[in-house]
Amino acid sequence: VVGGDECNINEHPFLVALYTSTSSTIHCGGALINREWVLTAAHCDRRNIRIKLGMHSKNIRNEDEQIRVPRGKYFCLNTKFPNGLDKDIMLIRLRRPVTYSTHIAPVSLPSRSRGVGSRCRIMGWGKISTTEDTYPDVPHCTNIFIVKHKWCEPLYPWVPADSRTLCAGILKGGRDTCHGDSGGPLICNGQIQGIVAGGSEPCGQHLKPAVYTKVFDYNNWIQNIIAGNRTVTCPP
């Protein structure tokens, strides 16, 4: 996250870090939505993925941190683009449910969608500098706004006007998600409204907001997958 500050240690109990068994680098974020399921972006998938919950600082452990491996990973079966970026959403079922604790708790799925002008919060362990490869020891947070979708369409050819995405940022620039924040949540009014999908390079440029998968449109898919209906397709 560029243009942010260290998150409050108690404001992100649902935020998870994704890395692999072969690398301790956090390549993506994600969000815990119940004791057994994590929501993230499809492009965050890796072999040998690991999920760390209850983490704040990479160096100073929270006493209630937990690590999990996937029992299953679920994607949209009906993507239009071969890379699946038009439906950039993935559900990870944890091999063992987590125990909720001080720093581990779920975030609610959206009860309604949020419109242009809504103020939302972004968070993650991604890059904090637009010019250098600086990654923080702690997650950074900041507030951005949902903006008109037309700002994103020319920037990201895989997000047509009818795509189930949100365009969000600060039009004058300066505050944005960045490398390593992918898959993390866009939180509006205490609910997860978006998943970090893609952005411009470098991050936080003037008139270049980022694109987020619109979670509200996938509520039905998410609930079906969790309920055990594996044949459900994502909205077109």
UniProtKB/Swiss-Prot annotation:
EC number: 3.4.21.95
Active site positions, chain numbering: H43 (charge relay system), D88 (charge relay system), S182 (charge relay system)
Catalyzed chemical reaction(s): Fully activates human clotting factor V by a single cleavage at the 1545-Trp-Tyr-Leu-Arg-|-Ser-Asn-Asn-Gly-1552 bond. Cattle, but not rabbit, factor V is cleaved, and no other proteins of the clotting system are attacked. Esterase activity is observed on Bz-Arg-OEt and Tos-Arg-OMe, and amidase activity on Phe-pipecolyl-Arg-NHPhNO2
Glycosites: N229
GO molecular-function term, one example from the UniProt record: toxin activity
Subcellular location(s) of the protein: Secreted
Cystine bridges: C7-C141, C28-C44, C76-C234, C120-C188, C152-C167, C178-C203
Transmembrane segments: none
UniProt superkingdom: Eukaryota
Tissue distribution of the protein: Expressed by the venom gland.
PANTHER family in the record: KALLIKREIN-1, KALLIKREIN-RELATED
Entry's family note: Belongs to the peptidase S1 family. Snake venom subfamily.
Complex and partners: Monomer.
Cited function: Venom serine protease that activates factor V (F5) in a calcium-independent manner. It cleaves the Arg(1545)-Ser(1546) linkage in the human factor V molecule. Induces the coagulation of mammalian plasma.
Protein name, as recorded: Factor V activator RVV-V alpha
